[in-house]
Amino acid sequence: DRGGARAAMTLHSDLVAGRWHTMSLMDQLGNAGSEVSRALRARENGNASRERSALHRFLELMDLTIADARLRGRRRELCRAREVVCDYFVGDNAYRSTPESLDRYFLAFAKAARRGR
């Protein structure tokens, strides 16, 4: 059942319903970055299942961000950020990312979002 598979892929259903596209870019990337942090922590603790789940949530949030019409001019950077995270977790780490560099990149957005409140 394709509909069931689609529903299973939607981990953040309330966000898909429209709330995500009302959030600022800083909030969106801060939230996506939280999933990166969770994936990094799970990897450090040897929990492949939690790592994979957090990575899937990150990908869903990044895909929602990339699809946000307000951010059309930022798609290249957003796609690159998504690519770098995927490269680290499931690729050859061609970008030579470290857990610290990934955390630092996304933490900057979370801090900016908090300052903006």
Question: Where on the chain are the PLM-derived regions?
Answer:
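Surface-exposed peri-terminal alpha-helical interaction modules
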Residues: D1-R117
